[in-house]
Each structure stands twice: as C-alpha cells, then as structure tokens.
C-alpha cells in the first residue's frame, strides 16, 4: 500500500429505468459501463463512493461491477451498500397530487426500490459492523431544519426522511490500524418542486446534517478525526438554483478542508447546460492533502455528464 490514500467519488450515471436492467447491462458489457470501468481503473482509487448506482436486494449489480473492475486490474474486496431511500415507497401521497405509489411518493425519488442509490467500494477493510446508516433519520428531527416552510401535511412530515439517498458514516481501517471515518451522501437536486421550494430546502438540510453531526447536536456522537465528507451535494457554491448557506458553511468550516480539485473545466464536476461543481471530498483539517483532481470520462453522453473527483491524503 502506498503512503497515500486516494479517495474518490463519482456519479457515473449507472442507473436504469427498471430493476435488473443495470445488472443486464454490466453482464453485456454495455459501452457506458465499459467506459466507467476504464475511467475508474485509470484513476485507481483506494476508496470509491459511487453515487447514481442502482441498488438491488442481493447486491448483484454491485458484485458484477466489482468483478468488471477486478478484470480490469482493480480489486475492491470490501463493499458497503445498504438499502437507500431512493425508490423506497412511503405509502403516502408525498407530493400531494392525489395519488400514491409514484416515484415522488418514495422517500427519495425513484421508479423502483434502489434506483440511483450509492455504493462504497474499498481496497482497505471497512468496519461495516460499526458503520452508521442515518437513512431513517427524519427531516423534522434535524436541529435548525427548513422543513417548516416546505408545505408538508402533518402525516407526511411525521414520516419524511431527510436523506434522498442516504447519509453514512463508514470507518475504513488504515494500514496503521486507525479508522478513517467516511461520511458519505448523495443529496436531492434543489429543483423539480414548486414555490414552497421543498427540494431546495431538503437539499440544504442534507448538507446541514453533517454540520450538526460534527457539532454533536444529533443523538449519535460525532465521529473522531480523521474523517472525510464525500459525495454528491447536488449544489454548486455559486451557480444554479439552491440554498447555499449550509454548503458554504461546510466549505469554510475550520474542521474541514476543501482541496478544490480541478480538471479541464476547472472545479466543475457536472455539465447541465453550464459547468457546475456538485461533487465534493472534504477531508478533516488534520489530514495532509497531497493531490486532487477532477477527471472527465470519454464515451457515451450519460457517462460524460459527470466527472470523477479524487483526493490523495497522507496516511495518518
């Protein structure tokens, strides 16, 4: 193992319109899947958070994708992918259109359970037995949340989870035996709502969750250093729609550092009309960053809309 650790996060667009379709595409060697494998194998992260990756009950798609990576020379024997909120039906009419069981009635948008979930792959051991999955954390339970203005009916407010996909704290075991806590998430886009700005409020609070967690303001104690926040905040610090105060607080928090990885489009990690920085890796301030970059893929459009972000840290 090298003396540095490479962390990466990427929304590779490995999501399909129905259950089982991603597994089928992986097995067939779909061009988008092949492009994703090639990019990851070229970057060679030690730990990779994949967002926008379809979850299934038996983890078959993730196992098949890991096998494809292994065939390309990059083995990830350690993986973590609990059921996400994406596509998890609430049983209620969450969007208030008079119908239930639709994609917007799930705890996180999804046509089926697990659509566009997330997965953690690691060359180093993960202490999954000590992992904290905050996916069931209620939006209304977050101190200082913006739920009050979201226009939710009382019965919806009582069950609405904060995470559109998930919030995880997963310890990775470093060669020294120390734990590095990986704080992973993939937020809802601050779009596709009405004047109540429900998704904008929720997106803001998904970032604010980490501030409250580090503050010790949640029922669970904060993680000890070293740690790193990584994932898809789905919000640019300056451009596009969204409520930026919580993200700005994370980027300027003295407990964290922002290496500002850059590539051919600067710090942008996505292109939706304009280049936007949506994906982040924020190591704790005690870690020494030795490198960082944004890597854009070649290949089919869906694979090329989002870039992989990596950060190298010295092993503590």
Question: Language-model segments: which ranges?
Answer:
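Solvent-exposed, acidic/flexible segments
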Residues: 25-33, 54-62, 110, 114, ...
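Short, solvent-exposed loop/turn and secondary-structure capping segments
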Residues: 18-21, 59-62, 90-94, 131-134, ...
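Metal-dependent phosphoester-hydrolase catalytic domains
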Residues: 125-135, 162, 171-174, 200-208, ...
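Active-site beta-strand/loop signature of hydrolases that rely on acidic residues for catalysis
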Residues: 7-12, 36-62, 82-84, 117, ...
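Active-site His/acidic residue clusters
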Residues: 178-201
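N-terminal, active-site-proximal structural segment of metallo-dependent hydrolase catalytic domains
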Residues: 1-118, 156-158, 176-180, 315-316
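Solvent-exposed loop/turn segments at secondary-structure junctions
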Residues: 12-16, 53-57, 84-89, 126-127, ...
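A well-ordered secondary-structure block
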Residues: 93-175
């Amino acid at each position: 193992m090298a003396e540095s650790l490479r962390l990466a996060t990427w929304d590779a667009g490995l999501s399909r319109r129905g259950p089982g379709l991603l597994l089928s595409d992986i097995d067939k060697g779909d061009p988008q899947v092949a492009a994703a494998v090639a990019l990851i194998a070229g970057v060679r992260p030690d730990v990779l958070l994949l967002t926008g990756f379809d979850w299934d009950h038996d983890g078959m798609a993730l196992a098949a994708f890991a096998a494809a990576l292994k065939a390309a020379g990059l083995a990830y024997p350690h993986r973590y992918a609990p059921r996400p909120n994406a596509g998890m039906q609430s049983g209620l009419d969450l969007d208030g259109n008079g119908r239930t069981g639709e994609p917007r009635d799930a705890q996180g948008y999804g046509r089926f359970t697990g659509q566009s979930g997330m997965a953690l792959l690691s060359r180093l051991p993960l202490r999954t037995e000590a992992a904290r999955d905050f996916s069931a954390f209620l939006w209304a339970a977050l101190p200082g949340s913006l739920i009050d203005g979201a226009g939710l009916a009382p019965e919806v407010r009582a069950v609405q989870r904060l995470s559109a996909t998930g919030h995880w704290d997963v310890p990775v075991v470093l060669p020294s035996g120390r734990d590095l806590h990986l704080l992973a998430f993939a937020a809802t886009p601050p779009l596709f709502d009405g004047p109540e700005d429900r998704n904008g409020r929720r997106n803001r609070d998904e970032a604010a969750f980490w501030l409250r967690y580090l503050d010790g303001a949640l029922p669970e104690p904060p993680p000890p250093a070293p740690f790193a926040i990584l994932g898809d905040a789905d919000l640019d610090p300056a451009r596009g729609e969204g409520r930026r105060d919580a993200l700005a607080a994370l980027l300027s928090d003295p407990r964290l550092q922002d290496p500002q990885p850059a590539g051919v489009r600067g710090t942008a990690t996505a292109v939706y009309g304009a280049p936007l920085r949506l994906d982040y890796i924020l190591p704790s301030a005690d870690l020494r960053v030795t490198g960082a970059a944004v890597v854009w893929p070649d290949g089919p459009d869906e694979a090329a809309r989002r870039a992989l972000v990596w950060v190298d840290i010295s092993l503590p």
